[in-house]
Amino acid sequence: YIEEEYYENGKDKVAFFISTNVGEDEKELSKIASGGEMSRMMLAIKTVLANTDNTPILIFDEIDTGISGKAANAVAEKLNQISGKHQVLCISHLPNIAAVADFNYFISKSVVNDRTSTSIKQLNEQEIINEIARISSGEVNEVTIKYADKLRNKKIAS
């Protein structure tokens, strides 16, 4: 569509229209997509533009919302790919995505004296393995640690 108003950077404004299901009419992406879907659409665009885009830092907030399995692996692969040209910050709850990160941080909230505070801790490699194990099944045991280690080693090998 065409905007007739002028903005600080001109009068061009872009809207993406997509059909998310066979037989459905195209609708404006910003009106029908969830936050996770918007992040994945941005990832797709940034992947295509990775070699020409000068944006130094890309932030993806919960890009893994509503996905798992092969879709999560594909997102992890694309994040890893664009991280070669950009600094990527990604908030994730999926082991597949956490496993490909060069650095992992654990963010936690606590209540002290009726005040909520947030803390962040950079994880060392063993802590990364343990956290990937925890988010993969809710517990840390021999099986989940082996799985987490396999995911991390797959990342290191690629």
What are these regions (language model features)?
Residues 27, 52-53, 65-73:
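Conserved D-loop-proximal element of ABC-family nucleotide-binding domains
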Residues 29-34, 65-67, 120-123:
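Short, contiguous acidic/charged loop-to-helix segments that flank catalytic cores in large enzymes
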Residues 70-158:
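C-terminal lobe/lid and adjacent interdomain/linker elements of RecA-like ASCE P-loop ATPase modules
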Residues 1-38:
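SMC-family hinge/dimerization module
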Residues 15-16, 20-22, 36-58:
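GG-anchored amphipathic helix commonly corresponding to the ABC/SMC/Rad50 NBD signature/C-loop
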Residues 61-62:
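Walker B catalytic acidic pair
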Residues 15-16, 32, 40-44, 128-138:
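Internal helix-turn-beta structural module
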Residues 10-12, 52-54, 83-85:
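Short loop/turn elements that form and flank the Walker-type P-loop nucleotide-binding site
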